[in-house]
């Protein structure tokens, strides 16, 4: 009988703890003032991680494409931009912009950076998928070259475009 009381009491305590620890969390940023002008951009491709590599031949004529998804809960009267940088730190034999490849638009026209930062604009902060384009320049130097492309946080007075921890980095390997 005493064992039955202990089991019953334990069950009541467990149930009370279970129900009292439940808390409704609001995960949708809509209506949270500090997040109303905060957006996210991430590479939109499989795998959803930071290891994806486009491995191409140096004489490839087709543009290299990396789709980027912009996440927003609102339409705005301004045009936020996701920013990206080309990283060579820690890369042996890095690819060189202007020598091994160029950053281009979808028509193949060269895009210039501002202090090493490139921008991908999302008009009216509308959720959509756009693309980063790269053109291989057929450099005849021997060896495989590699470059890292990182989406970086862009903070202005009007908005912030952040990145995801698992979808902000891609690589190009030119063979």
Predicted feature locations:
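Sec-dependent bacterial lipoprotein signal peptides
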Residues: 1-22
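Bacterial Sec-dependent N-terminal signal peptides
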Residues: 16-46, 164-171, 175
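Beta-sheet-dominated interaction scaffolds and their linkers
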Residues: 32-72
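Beta-strand-rich interaction surfaces with strong enrichment in secreted/lumenal proteins
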Residues: 53-55, 117-123, 137
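Short, solvent-exposed loop/turn segments enriched in Ser/Thr/Gly
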Residues: 60-66, 128-132, 143-147, 167-168
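Contiguous beta-strand segments of beta-sheet-rich domains
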Residues: 78-91, 101, 130-155
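Short proline/glycine- and polar residue-rich coil/turn motifs
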Residues: 109-114, 120-128
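Short, exposed beta-strand-loop hairpins at the edges of beta-sheets
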Residues: 156-163
